[in-house]
UniProtKB/Swiss-Prot annotation:
Binds specifically to cytosolic chaperonin (c-CPN) and transfers target proteins to it. Binds to nascent polypeptide chain and promotes folding in an environment in which there are many competing pathways for nonnative proteins. Required for positioning of the mitotic spindle. Heterohexamer of two PFD-alpha type and four PFD-beta type subunits. This is Probable prefoldin subunit 6. Belongs to the prefoldin subunit beta family.
Amino acid sequence: MADMAKFEEEISKLKTLEKDREKYFSSRQEMEMRLTESKNVKAELDLMDSDSKVYKLMGPVLVRQDLEEARSTVEKRLEFIESEIKRVEASITDVNKKSIEQRDKVMNMQKAFQMMATQAQQQAAQKK
């Protein structure tokens, strides 16, 4: 039955879309955590006096860093994370749209199969 193979293929596509959506949600959640962490770092840096000492962890070593350089780095990180969140959210929107379309397609195929089964039962009952 080619129709059944097509139906299974469409279900497989739907499952793939749902896995992709979960992956994007997970990615967005991770980005949100990084954003919160970076905002906290920025808030701490903003509280510091201009003569405060700032250290950056580079591998196993703490290296002194200029306060303005640290602020700039954190600001760039915030911008990057925010742009990544927007990109991931656009992907989520896209995959949600595709999932809805695919789900509708699968449901329509399922309805068609049910109608065919009902018709076959009615024809079998009429032959008796």
